[in-house]
Amino acid sequence: MGNTCRGSIGGKTFQGYTQPEDSSCSTNHNPSSGNSYSSSDNFSPTSNAQQNSNHKKEHSLSLVSPRKASMNRSGSNQAYYVMGHMTPNIRDLYTLGRKLGQGQFGTTYLCTENSTGAEYACKSISKRKLISKEDVEDVRREIQIMHHLSGHRNIVTIKGAYEDPLYVHIVMEICSGGELFDRIIQRGHYSERKAAELTKIIVGVVEACHSLGVMHRDLKPENFLLVNKDNDFSLKAIDFGLSVFFKPGQIFTDVVGSPYYVAPEVLLKHYGPEADVWTAGVILYILLSGVPPFWAETQQGIFDAVLKGHIDFDSDPWPLISESAKDLIRKMLCMQPSERLTAHEVLCHPWICENGVAPDRALDPAVLSRLKQFSAMNKLKKMALRVIAESLSEEEIAGLREMFKAMDTDSSGAITFDELKAGLRKYGSTLKDTEIRELMDAADVDNSGTIDYGEFIAATVHLNKLEREEHLMAAFQYFDKDGSGYITVDEVQQACIEHNMTDVYFEDIIREVDQDNDGRIDYGEFVAMMQKGNPCIGRRTMRNSLNLSMRDAPGAQ
Protein backbone atom coordinates (compact mmCIF):
# COMPACT_ATOMS: atom_id res chain seq x y z
CA MET A 1 0.00 0.00 0.00
CA GLY A 2 3.00 2.27 -0.07
CA ASN A 3 4.31 4.41 2.75
CA THR A 4 1.93 3.44 5.54
CA CYS A 5 3.84 5.36 8.18
CA ARG A 6 2.62 8.58 6.63
CA GLY A 7 -0.94 7.68 5.75
CA SER A 8 -2.39 6.04 2.70
CA ILE A 9 -4.55 7.02 -0.21
CA GLY A 10 -7.32 5.00 1.37
CA GLY A 11 -6.99 6.88 4.62
CA LYS A 12 -6.76 3.72 6.69
CA THR A 13 -3.86 4.87 8.84
CA PHE A 14 -3.90 8.62 9.46
CA GLN A 15 -7.22 10.42 9.46
CA GLY A 16 -5.24 13.66 9.57
CA TYR A 17 -4.07 12.85 6.07
CA THR A 18 -7.59 12.43 4.88
CA GLN A 19 -9.24 15.41 6.49
CA PRO A 20 -7.01 18.43 7.13
CA GLU A 21 -8.54 20.50 9.90
CA ASP A 22 -7.02 23.88 9.21
CA SER A 23 -9.15 25.60 6.58
CA SER A 24 -7.21 28.84 6.51
CA CYS A 25 -6.33 28.60 2.84
CA SER A 26 -8.12 31.26 0.85
CA THR A 27 -8.87 29.04 -2.11
CA ASN A 28 -10.90 30.37 -4.98
CA HIS A 29 -14.65 29.81 -4.90
CA ASN A 30 -15.80 28.67 -8.30
CA PRO A 31 -19.32 27.58 -9.10
CA SER A 32 -18.47 25.94 -12.37
CA SER A 33 -15.90 23.64 -10.87
CA GLY A 34 -17.61 20.49 -9.82
CA ASN A 35 -14.72 18.84 -7.99
CA SER A 36 -12.53 21.71 -6.92
CA TYR A 37 -13.25 21.85 -3.23
CA SER A 38 -14.64 18.56 -2.08
CA SER A 39 -14.48 15.16 -3.58
CA SER A 40 -18.15 14.80 -2.75
CA ASP A 41 -19.03 18.02 -4.59
CA ASN A 42 -19.01 16.23 -7.86
CA PHE A 43 -20.37 17.21 -11.26
CA SER A 44 -18.48 14.46 -13.03
CA PRO A 45 -20.25 12.87 -16.01
CA THR A 46 -20.01 9.36 -14.59
CA SER A 47 -22.01 6.35 -13.65
CA ASN A 48 -24.11 5.84 -10.54
CA ALA A 49 -21.55 3.39 -9.21
CA GLN A 50 -18.91 6.04 -9.20
CA GLN A 51 -21.17 8.64 -7.62
CA ASN A 52 -22.08 6.24 -4.85
CA SER A 53 -18.44 6.18 -3.80
CA ASN A 54 -18.49 9.83 -2.79
CA HIS A 55 -19.27 9.13 0.86
CA LYS A 56 -16.22 6.88 0.91
CA LYS A 57 -14.01 9.68 -0.34
CA GLU A 58 -15.18 12.00 2.38
CA HIS A 59 -13.52 9.55 4.79
CA SER A 60 -10.53 8.72 2.65
CA LEU A 61 -8.91 11.74 1.05
CA SER A 62 -10.26 15.27 1.19
CA LEU A 63 -7.88 17.00 -1.17
CA VAL A 64 -9.11 20.53 -0.79
CA SER A 65 -10.26 23.03 1.73
CA PRO A 66 -13.96 23.30 2.58
CA ARG A 67 -15.98 26.08 1.03
CA LYS A 68 -16.39 29.26 2.97
CA ALA A 69 -19.85 29.76 4.38
CA SER A 70 -19.82 33.29 3.01
CA MET A 71 -17.98 34.95 0.14
CA ASN A 72 -16.30 38.32 0.26
CA ARG A 73 -17.15 39.18 -3.31
CA SER A 74 -18.81 42.22 -4.66
CA GLY A 75 -21.32 42.01 -7.43
CA SER A 76 -24.97 41.50 -8.07
CA ASN A 77 -26.99 38.43 -9.01
CA GLN A 78 -26.33 36.81 -12.33
CA ALA A 79 -27.23 38.49 -15.59
CA TYR A 80 -30.35 37.18 -17.28
CA TYR A 81 -28.22 35.41 -19.88
CA VAL A 82 -25.16 33.86 -18.28
CA MET A 83 -23.88 32.90 -21.72
CA GLY A 84 -24.57 36.35 -23.10
CA HIS A 85 -27.07 35.21 -25.71
CA MET A 86 -30.14 33.07 -26.20
CA THR A 87 -29.67 29.38 -26.87
CA PRO A 88 -31.97 26.63 -28.10
CA ASN A 89 -34.14 24.95 -25.49
CA ILE A 90 -32.19 21.93 -24.29
CA ARG A 91 -35.40 19.91 -23.97
CA ASP A 92 -36.04 20.30 -27.68
CA LEU A 93 -32.76 18.52 -28.35
CA TYR A 94 -32.25 16.18 -25.39
CA THR A 95 -34.25 14.15 -22.91
CA LEU A 96 -32.85 14.40 -19.40
CA GLY A 97 -32.75 11.10 -17.53
CA ARG A 98 -31.52 9.79 -14.22
CA LYS A 99 -29.27 11.77 -11.93
CA LEU A 100 -25.60 10.86 -12.12
CA GLY A 101 -24.25 13.19 -9.47
CA GLN A 102 -25.09 16.06 -7.15
CA GLY A 103 -22.88 19.05 -6.41
CA GLN A 104 -23.21 22.25 -4.45
CA PHE A 105 -24.10 24.29 -7.52
CA GLY A 106 -26.04 21.82 -9.60
CA THR A 107 -26.66 18.31 -10.77
CA THR A 108 -25.32 16.00 -13.47
CA TYR A 109 -27.89 13.99 -15.42
CA LEU A 110 -27.78 11.32 -18.05
CA CYS A 111 -29.26 12.83 -21.20
CA THR A 112 -30.23 11.35 -24.55
CA GLU A 113 -30.03 13.21 -27.85
CA ASN A 114 -33.50 13.08 -29.36
CA SER A 115 -32.34 12.91 -32.97
CA THR A 116 -29.79 10.10 -32.57
CA GLY A 117 -30.48 8.32 -29.29
CA ALA A 118 -26.86 8.91 -28.25
CA GLU A 119 -26.23 9.27 -24.52
CA TYR A 120 -24.35 12.16 -22.95
CA ALA A 121 -23.88 13.73 -19.54
CA CYS A 122 -25.56 17.05 -18.78
CA LYS A 123 -24.14 19.23 -16.02
CA SER A 124 -26.90 21.65 -14.96
CA ILE A 125 -25.64 24.64 -12.96
CA SER A 126 -28.20 26.56 -10.93
CA LYS A 127 -28.25 30.23 -11.92
CA ARG A 128 -29.77 31.08 -8.56
CA LYS A 129 -26.46 30.21 -6.95
CA LEU A 130 -24.40 32.44 -9.24
CA ILE A 131 -24.40 35.40 -6.89
CA SER A 132 -21.79 37.66 -8.49
CA LYS A 133 -20.49 38.74 -11.86
CA GLU A 134 -17.37 36.71 -11.18
CA ASP A 135 -19.48 33.58 -10.68
CA VAL A 136 -21.06 34.19 -14.07
CA GLU A 137 -17.67 34.73 -15.69
CA ASP A 138 -16.39 31.51 -14.15
CA VAL A 139 -19.16 29.47 -15.78
CA ARG A 140 -18.82 31.29 -19.09
CA ARG A 141 -15.06 30.77 -19.12
CA GLU A 142 -15.37 27.06 -18.35
CA ILE A 143 -17.60 26.64 -21.41
CA GLN A 144 -15.19 28.66 -23.57
CA ILE A 145 -12.22 26.58 -22.47
CA MET A 146 -14.02 23.29 -23.06
CA HIS A 147 -14.81 24.41 -26.61
CA HIS A 148 -11.22 25.61 -27.09
CA LEU A 149 -9.75 22.26 -26.03
CA SER A 150 -12.35 20.14 -27.80
CA GLY A 151 -10.82 17.51 -30.04
CA HIS A 152 -8.10 16.16 -27.76
CA ARG A 153 -8.66 12.48 -27.17
CA ASN A 154 -7.95 12.73 -23.43
CA ILE A 155 -10.16 15.75 -22.75
CA VAL A 156 -13.89 15.31 -22.35
CA THR A 157 -15.69 16.60 -25.44
CA ILE A 158 -18.32 19.30 -25.00
CA LYS A 159 -21.37 18.72 -27.15
CA GLY A 160 -23.03 22.06 -26.47
CA ALA A 161 -24.12 24.56 -23.83
CA TYR A 162 -27.66 25.75 -23.26
CA GLU A 163 -29.43 28.13 -20.95
CA ASP A 164 -32.94 28.51 -19.61
CA PRO A 165 -34.31 30.84 -16.91
CA LEU A 166 -33.08 28.57 -14.09
CA TYR A 167 -30.01 26.69 -15.28
CA VAL A 168 -26.98 26.64 -17.51
CA HIS A 169 -26.66 23.16 -19.04
CA ILE A 170 -23.34 21.80 -20.32
CA VAL A 171 -23.77 18.66 -22.43
CA MET A 172 -20.64 16.53 -22.80
CA GLU A 173 -19.57 13.01 -23.58
CA ILE A 174 -20.26 10.52 -20.82
CA CYS A 175 -17.47 8.67 -19.04
CA SER A 176 -18.83 5.64 -17.24
CA GLY A 177 -15.63 3.93 -16.12
CA GLY A 178 -15.16 5.75 -12.83
CA GLU A 179 -12.41 7.99 -11.49
CA LEU A 180 -8.67 7.51 -11.58
CA PHE A 181 -8.92 8.34 -7.86
CA ASP A 182 -10.88 5.16 -7.20
CA ARG A 183 -8.41 3.07 -9.19
CA ILE A 184 -5.56 4.35 -7.02
CA ILE A 185 -7.50 3.46 -3.87
CA GLN A 186 -8.22 -0.02 -5.22
CA ARG A 187 -4.66 -0.72 -6.33
CA GLY A 188 -2.65 1.10 -3.65
CA HIS A 189 -0.10 2.04 -6.29
CA TYR A 190 0.78 1.21 -9.89
CA SER A 191 3.69 -0.53 -11.54
CA GLU A 192 6.25 1.80 -13.07
CA ARG A 193 5.19 0.89 -16.60
CA LYS A 194 1.51 1.58 -15.95
CA ALA A 195 2.34 4.74 -14.00
CA ALA A 196 4.43 5.93 -16.94
CA GLU A 197 1.56 5.35 -19.37
CA LEU A 198 -0.88 7.22 -17.13
CA THR A 199 1.60 10.05 -16.59
CA LYS A 200 2.08 10.33 -20.35
CA ILE A 201 -1.67 10.82 -20.73
CA ILE A 202 -1.97 13.31 -17.85
CA VAL A 203 1.04 15.38 -18.92
CA GLY A 204 -0.18 15.19 -22.52
CA VAL A 205 -3.34 16.95 -21.35
CA VAL A 206 -1.19 19.56 -19.59
CA GLU A 207 0.84 20.12 -22.75
CA ALA A 208 -2.30 20.43 -24.85
CA CYS A 209 -3.72 23.00 -22.44
CA HIS A 210 -0.52 25.04 -22.29
CA SER A 211 -0.02 24.86 -26.04
CA LEU A 212 -3.41 26.50 -26.49
CA GLY A 213 -2.94 29.13 -23.81
CA VAL A 214 -4.90 27.42 -21.02
CA MET A 215 -3.69 26.79 -17.47
CA HIS A 216 -5.69 24.03 -15.74
CA ARG A 217 -4.94 24.95 -12.10
CA ASP A 218 -6.72 21.98 -10.51
CA LEU A 219 -5.28 18.73 -11.81
CA LYS A 220 -5.90 15.76 -9.53
CA PRO A 221 -6.97 12.12 -9.88
CA GLU A 222 -10.65 12.94 -9.25
CA ASN A 223 -10.63 15.15 -12.32
CA PHE A 224 -9.70 12.26 -14.62
CA LEU A 225 -12.43 9.79 -15.55
CA LEU A 226 -12.26 6.51 -17.40
CA VAL A 227 -14.40 6.14 -20.51
CA ASN A 228 -14.28 2.37 -20.08
CA LYS A 229 -13.91 0.68 -16.69
CA ASP A 230 -11.96 -2.14 -18.34
CA ASN A 231 -9.29 0.16 -19.75
CA ASP A 232 -7.03 1.99 -17.30
CA PHE A 233 -5.73 4.21 -20.10
CA SER A 234 -9.09 5.52 -21.38
CA LEU A 235 -8.62 8.69 -19.31
CA LYS A 236 -10.45 11.97 -19.89
CA ALA A 237 -9.85 15.25 -18.09
CA ILE A 238 -13.30 16.49 -17.07
CA ASP A 239 -13.20 19.61 -14.89
CA PHE A 240 -12.06 23.01 -16.16
CA GLY A 241 -13.91 25.12 -13.62
CA LEU A 242 -10.72 26.72 -12.28
CA SER A 243 -8.93 26.88 -15.63
CA VAL A 244 -7.96 30.22 -17.16
CA PHE A 245 -6.56 31.58 -20.39
CA PHE A 246 -3.01 32.91 -20.10
CA LYS A 247 -0.46 34.75 -22.20
CA PRO A 248 3.29 34.00 -22.15
CA GLY A 249 4.87 35.64 -19.14
CA GLN A 250 1.56 36.44 -17.46
CA ILE A 251 1.66 36.13 -13.66
CA PHE A 252 -1.30 34.97 -11.57
CA THR A 253 -1.80 35.74 -7.89
CA ASP A 254 -5.07 34.11 -6.79
CA VAL A 255 -4.64 30.99 -4.66
CA VAL A 256 -6.66 28.16 -6.17
CA GLY A 257 -6.46 24.41 -6.32
CA SER A 258 -6.15 21.53 -3.90
CA PRO A 259 -3.73 21.48 -0.94
CA TYR A 260 -1.96 18.18 -1.60
CA TYR A 261 -1.36 19.17 -5.23
CA VAL A 262 -0.77 22.93 -5.06
CA ALA A 263 2.59 24.26 -6.24
CA PRO A 264 4.69 26.38 -3.86
CA GLU A 265 4.57 29.41 -6.14
CA VAL A 266 0.76 29.32 -6.02
CA LEU A 267 0.92 29.61 -2.23
CA LEU A 268 3.35 32.51 -2.73
CA LYS A 269 0.83 34.15 -5.11
CA HIS A 270 3.20 34.47 -8.05
CA TYR A 271 2.77 31.72 -10.63
CA GLY A 272 2.18 30.67 -14.21
CA PRO A 273 1.46 27.47 -16.16
CA GLU A 274 4.50 25.67 -14.74
CA ALA A 275 2.37 25.10 -11.61
CA ASP A 276 0.44 22.48 -13.60
CA VAL A 277 3.66 20.48 -14.10
CA TRP A 278 4.24 20.46 -10.32
CA THR A 279 0.74 19.14 -9.81
CA ALA A 280 1.30 16.41 -12.39
CA GLY A 281 4.48 15.50 -10.52
CA VAL A 282 2.48 15.07 -7.32
CA ILE A 283 0.08 12.76 -9.16
CA LEU A 284 3.02 10.71 -10.45
CA TYR A 285 4.41 10.36 -6.91
CA ILE A 286 0.99 9.12 -5.74
CA LEU A 287 0.68 6.69 -8.65
CA LEU A 288 3.98 5.07 -7.69
CA SER A 289 3.65 5.09 -3.90
CA GLY A 290 -0.01 5.46 -2.98
CA VAL A 291 0.64 8.56 -0.84
CA PRO A 292 1.19 12.26 -1.58
CA PRO A 293 4.72 13.65 -1.32
CA PHE A 294 3.64 16.51 0.96
CA TRP A 295 1.48 15.49 3.89
CA ALA A 296 0.50 16.76 7.33
CA GLU A 297 -2.43 16.50 9.72
CA THR A 298 -3.62 20.03 9.03
CA GLN A 299 -4.02 22.06 5.89
CA GLN A 300 -1.47 24.60 7.06
CA GLY A 301 0.90 21.74 7.76
CA ILE A 302 0.48 20.54 4.18
CA PHE A 303 1.29 24.02 2.89
CA ASP A 304 4.39 24.21 5.10
CA ALA A 305 5.54 20.86 3.70
CA VAL A 306 4.95 22.06 0.13
CA LEU A 307 6.99 25.21 0.75
CA LYS A 308 9.87 23.15 2.21
CA GLY A 309 9.79 20.86 -0.81
CA HIS A 310 11.42 17.81 0.80
CA ILE A 311 10.59 14.66 -1.16
CA ASP A 312 10.77 11.32 0.67
CA PHE A 313 12.45 8.67 -1.47
CA ASP A 314 13.55 6.53 1.49
CA SER A 315 10.32 4.94 2.71
CA ASP A 316 8.70 1.90 1.14
CA PRO A 317 8.25 1.40 -1.84
CA TRP A 318 10.83 3.94 -3.08
CA PRO A 319 13.95 1.76 -2.60
CA LEU A 320 12.44 -0.57 -5.22
CA ILE A 321 11.59 2.19 -7.71
CA SER A 322 13.98 3.09 -10.53
CA GLU A 323 16.33 6.05 -10.36
CA SER A 324 14.90 7.26 -13.67
CA ALA A 325 11.43 7.60 -12.15
CA LYS A 326 12.85 9.46 -9.16
CA ASP A 327 14.83 11.73 -11.46
CA LEU A 328 11.66 12.70 -13.32
CA ILE A 329 9.78 13.39 -10.09
CA ARG A 330 12.62 15.59 -8.79
CA LYS A 331 12.58 17.59 -12.01
CA MET A 332 8.78 17.98 -11.98
CA LEU A 333 8.78 18.94 -8.29
CA CYS A 334 11.63 21.41 -8.63
CA MET A 335 11.02 24.33 -6.27
CA GLN A 336 12.13 26.90 -8.87
CA PRO A 337 9.48 27.17 -11.61
CA SER A 338 12.05 28.41 -14.13
CA GLU A 339 14.12 25.24 -13.61
CA ARG A 340 11.17 22.85 -13.63
CA LEU A 341 10.62 20.66 -16.67
CA THR A 342 8.05 21.86 -19.17
CA ALA A 343 5.24 19.49 -20.09
CA HIS A 344 6.95 18.69 -23.39
CA GLU A 345 10.23 17.95 -21.60
CA VAL A 346 8.41 15.58 -19.27
CA LEU A 347 7.06 13.70 -22.27
CA CYS A 348 10.61 13.46 -23.65
CA HIS A 349 12.04 12.10 -20.40
CA PRO A 350 13.49 8.58 -20.85
CA TRP A 351 11.27 7.12 -18.14
CA ILE A 352 8.15 8.24 -20.03
CA CYS A 353 9.24 7.45 -23.56
CA GLU A 354 8.71 4.01 -24.99
CA ASN A 355 12.00 2.07 -24.99
CA GLY A 356 13.70 5.12 -23.56
CA VAL A 357 13.74 6.92 -26.90
CA ALA A 358 12.72 10.57 -26.92
CA PRO A 359 11.16 12.27 -29.96
CA ASP A 360 13.88 13.49 -32.32
CA ARG A 361 12.27 16.88 -32.81
CA ALA A 362 9.88 19.21 -31.10
CA LEU A 363 6.27 19.03 -32.14
CA ASP A 364 4.91 21.93 -34.16
CA PRO A 365 3.14 24.66 -32.22
CA ALA A 366 -0.63 24.30 -32.62
CA VAL A 367 -1.16 27.56 -34.45
CA LEU A 368 1.74 26.78 -36.76
CA SER A 369 0.42 23.30 -37.50
CA ARG A 370 -3.00 24.68 -38.31
CA LEU A 371 -1.56 27.41 -40.52
CA LYS A 372 0.32 24.74 -42.45
CA GLN A 373 -2.89 22.78 -42.96
CA PHE A 374 -4.70 25.94 -44.05
CA SER A 375 -1.97 26.88 -46.52
CA ALA A 376 -2.41 23.54 -48.31
CA MET A 377 -6.15 24.07 -48.86
CA ASN A 378 -7.69 25.22 -52.11
CA LYS A 379 -9.31 28.64 -52.35
CA LEU A 380 -12.86 27.37 -52.01
CA LYS A 381 -12.07 25.49 -48.81
CA LYS A 382 -10.34 28.57 -47.38
CA MET A 383 -13.39 30.69 -48.11
CA ALA A 384 -15.66 28.03 -46.63
CA LEU A 385 -13.62 27.96 -43.42
CA ARG A 386 -13.99 31.75 -43.20
CA VAL A 387 -17.77 31.37 -43.53
CA ILE A 388 -17.82 28.65 -40.85
CA ALA A 389 -15.58 30.68 -38.54
CA GLU A 390 -17.94 33.64 -38.77
CA SER A 391 -20.85 31.43 -37.73
CA LEU A 392 -19.19 30.02 -34.60
CA SER A 393 -20.49 31.18 -31.24
CA GLU A 394 -18.44 33.44 -28.99
CA GLU A 395 -17.73 30.64 -26.53
CA GLU A 396 -16.39 28.42 -29.33
CA ILE A 397 -13.75 30.93 -30.48
CA ALA A 398 -12.93 32.74 -27.23
CA GLY A 399 -9.64 30.86 -26.89
CA LEU A 400 -8.54 31.73 -30.41
CA ARG A 401 -9.53 35.34 -29.78
CA GLU A 402 -7.14 35.41 -26.80
CA MET A 403 -4.37 33.99 -28.96
CA PHE A 404 -5.03 36.58 -31.67
CA LYS A 405 -4.82 39.37 -29.09
CA ALA A 406 -1.52 37.96 -27.81
CA MET A 407 -0.02 38.13 -31.32
CA ASP A 408 -1.59 41.48 -32.27
CA THR A 409 0.79 43.39 -30.02
CA ASP A 410 -0.18 46.86 -31.26
CA SER A 411 -3.92 46.10 -31.00
CA SER A 412 -4.48 47.19 -34.58
CA GLY A 413 -6.94 44.40 -35.30
CA ALA A 414 -4.56 42.73 -37.75
CA ILE A 415 -1.38 40.69 -37.43
CA THR A 416 1.59 41.90 -39.46
CA PHE A 417 4.41 39.71 -40.71
CA ASP A 418 6.68 40.85 -37.88
CA GLU A 419 3.98 40.14 -35.29
CA LEU A 420 3.35 36.68 -36.73
CA LYS A 421 7.08 35.94 -36.75
CA ALA A 422 7.53 37.16 -33.17
CA GLY A 423 4.41 35.35 -31.99
CA LEU A 424 5.32 32.00 -33.53
CA ARG A 425 8.88 32.19 -32.25
CA LYS A 426 7.75 33.18 -28.79
CA TYR A 427 5.56 30.09 -28.80
CA GLY A 428 8.37 27.74 -29.84
CA SER A 429 8.60 27.88 -33.65
CA THR A 430 11.98 27.72 -35.40
CA LEU A 431 10.71 28.48 -38.91
CA LYS A 432 12.78 30.52 -41.32
CA ASP A 433 11.48 33.93 -42.41
CA THR A 434 10.69 32.58 -45.87
CA GLU A 435 8.55 29.81 -44.39
CA ILE A 436 6.70 32.25 -42.15
CA ARG A 437 6.10 34.49 -45.18
CA GLU A 438 4.54 31.55 -47.04
CA LEU A 439 2.18 30.89 -44.13
CA MET A 440 1.39 34.60 -43.91
CA ASP A 441 0.49 34.74 -47.59
CA ALA A 442 -1.67 31.63 -47.27
CA ALA A 443 -3.66 33.00 -44.34
CA ASP A 444 -3.97 36.48 -45.87
CA VAL A 445 -6.83 35.46 -48.12
CA ASP A 446 -7.80 39.01 -49.15
CA ASN A 447 -4.19 39.97 -49.98
CA SER A 448 -4.20 42.95 -47.62
CA GLY A 449 -0.68 42.27 -46.36
CA THR A 450 -1.91 41.42 -42.86
CA ILE A 451 -3.98 38.70 -41.19
CA ASP A 452 -7.19 40.16 -39.83
CA TYR A 453 -9.21 38.59 -37.04
CA GLY A 454 -11.54 36.69 -39.34
CA GLU A 455 -8.67 35.31 -41.38
CA PHE A 456 -6.85 34.21 -38.22
CA ILE A 457 -9.89 32.37 -36.86
CA ALA A 458 -10.51 30.69 -40.22
CA ALA A 459 -6.88 29.57 -40.49
CA THR A 460 -6.52 28.29 -36.92
CA VAL A 461 -9.94 26.90 -36.02
CA HIS A 462 -9.79 23.24 -35.11
CA LEU A 463 -10.84 21.08 -38.02
CA ASN A 464 -13.26 19.10 -35.87
CA LYS A 465 -15.64 21.99 -36.56
CA LEU A 466 -15.93 20.53 -40.06
CA GLU A 467 -17.73 17.51 -38.64
CA ARG A 468 -20.82 19.47 -37.80
CA GLU A 469 -23.56 19.20 -40.37
CA GLU A 470 -25.02 22.62 -39.66
CA HIS A 471 -21.67 24.29 -40.35
CA LEU A 472 -21.13 22.45 -43.60
CA MET A 473 -24.67 23.13 -44.79
CA ALA A 474 -24.44 26.83 -43.92
CA ALA A 475 -21.16 27.15 -45.81
CA PHE A 476 -22.56 25.35 -48.85
CA GLN A 477 -25.64 27.57 -48.87
CA TYR A 478 -23.40 30.66 -48.71
CA PHE A 479 -21.87 29.72 -52.05
CA ASP A 480 -25.08 28.34 -53.59
CA LYS A 481 -26.54 31.81 -54.06
CA ASP A 482 -29.51 30.75 -56.19
CA GLY A 483 -30.45 27.80 -53.98
CA SER A 484 -30.16 25.35 -56.86
CA GLY A 485 -28.33 22.74 -54.79
CA TYR A 486 -25.15 23.25 -56.79
CA ILE A 487 -22.16 25.61 -56.70
CA THR A 488 -21.38 26.87 -60.18
CA VAL A 489 -18.36 28.61 -61.69
CA ASP A 490 -20.20 31.95 -61.57
CA GLU A 491 -20.99 31.47 -57.87
CA VAL A 492 -17.35 30.64 -57.08
CA GLN A 493 -16.33 33.78 -58.97
CA GLN A 494 -18.82 35.88 -57.02
CA ALA A 495 -17.53 34.49 -53.70
CA CYS A 496 -13.94 35.26 -54.67
CA ILE A 497 -14.91 38.85 -55.42
CA GLU A 498 -16.62 39.14 -52.03
CA HIS A 499 -13.46 37.87 -50.32
CA ASN A 500 -11.11 40.03 -52.42
CA MET A 501 -9.39 36.92 -53.75
CA THR A 502 -7.39 37.44 -56.92
CA ASP A 503 -5.41 35.18 -59.25
CA VAL A 504 -8.02 32.48 -58.92
CA TYR A 505 -8.76 30.02 -61.72
CA PHE A 506 -12.42 29.31 -61.10
CA GLU A 507 -12.65 26.40 -63.51
CA ASP A 508 -9.73 24.70 -61.76
CA ILE A 509 -11.52 24.92 -58.41
CA ILE A 510 -14.63 23.33 -59.86
CA ARG A 511 -12.60 20.67 -61.66
CA GLU A 512 -10.73 19.70 -58.48
CA VAL A 513 -13.90 19.16 -56.45
CA ASP A 514 -16.34 18.02 -59.15
CA GLN A 515 -16.22 14.23 -58.89
CA ASP A 516 -18.91 13.40 -61.45
CA ASN A 517 -17.60 15.90 -64.03
CA ASP A 518 -20.90 17.72 -64.51
CA GLY A 519 -19.22 21.13 -64.23
CA ARG A 520 -20.64 22.02 -60.84
CA ILE A 521 -20.31 21.06 -57.16
CA ASP A 522 -23.13 19.35 -55.31
CA TYR A 523 -23.39 19.11 -51.52
CA GLY A 524 -21.80 15.66 -51.31
CA GLU A 525 -18.80 16.80 -53.33
CA PHE A 526 -18.52 19.92 -51.17
CA VAL A 527 -18.50 17.87 -47.94
CA ALA A 528 -15.91 15.49 -49.38
CA MET A 529 -13.68 18.46 -50.20
CA MET A 530 -14.07 19.94 -46.73
CA GLN A 531 -13.15 16.71 -44.97
CA LYS A 532 -10.43 15.57 -47.34
CA GLY A 533 -7.01 15.61 -45.73
CA ASN A 534 -8.28 16.49 -42.28
CA PRO A 535 -6.15 14.44 -39.89
CA CYS A 536 -8.10 12.13 -37.56
CA ILE A 537 -11.37 13.84 -38.31
CA GLY A 538 -13.98 12.89 -35.78
CA ARG A 539 -13.80 11.71 -32.21
CA ARG A 540 -10.30 10.36 -32.78
CA THR A 541 -8.91 13.83 -33.44
CA MET A 542 -5.82 14.41 -31.32
CA ARG A 543 -4.63 17.83 -30.41
CA ASN A 544 -1.36 16.31 -29.21
CA SER A 545 -0.28 16.70 -32.83
CA LEU A 546 -1.09 20.41 -32.69
CA ASN A 547 1.15 21.60 -29.89
CA LEU A 548 1.59 25.35 -29.50
CA SER A 549 4.63 25.71 -27.28
CA MET A 550 3.46 28.55 -25.07
CA ARG A 551 5.17 26.52 -22.35
CA ASP A 552 8.54 27.38 -23.93
CA ALA A 553 7.87 31.11 -24.22
CA PRO A 554 10.23 33.41 -22.30
CA GLY A 555 8.73 34.15 -18.94
CA ALA A 556 6.02 31.55 -19.28
CA GLN A 557 7.89 28.87 -17.39
From Swiss-Prot:
Binding site for Ca(2+) 1: 408, 410, 412, 419
Pfam families, alphabetized: EF-hand_7, Pkinase
Annotated positions binding Ca(2+) 4: 514, 516, 518, 520, 525
EF-hand domain location: 395-430, 431-466, 467-502, 506-536
Compartment(s) of residence: Membrane
Origin: domain of life: Eukaryota
Protein kinase domain ranges (all copies): 94-352
Keywords, comma-separated and alphabetical: ATP-binding, Calcium, Kinase, Lipoprotein, Membrane, Metal-binding, Myristate, Nucleotide-binding, Phosphoprotein, Repeat, Serine/threonine-protein kinase, Transferase
Active-site residues (renumbered): 218 (proton acceptor)
Catalytic activity entry: L-seryl-[protein] + ATP = O-phospho-L-seryl-[protein] + ADP + H(+); L-threonyl-[protein] + ATP = O-phospho-L-threonyl-[protein] + ADP + H(+)
Low complexity bias spans: 28-48
Residues with a covalently attached lipid (N-myristoyl glycine): 2
Annotated stretches, region: Autoinhibitory domain: 358-388
Keyword Ribosomal protein attributed: no
Activity regulation description: Activated by calcium. Autophosphorylation may play an important role in the regulation of the kinase activity.
UniProt-annotated binding residues for Ca(2+) 2: 444, 446, 448, 450, 455
Region (Disordered): 1-72
Chief place where the protein resides: membrane
Sequence positions that bind ATP: 100-108, 123
Name assigned to this protein: Calcium-dependent protein kinase 4
Species for this entry: Solanum tuberosum (Potato)
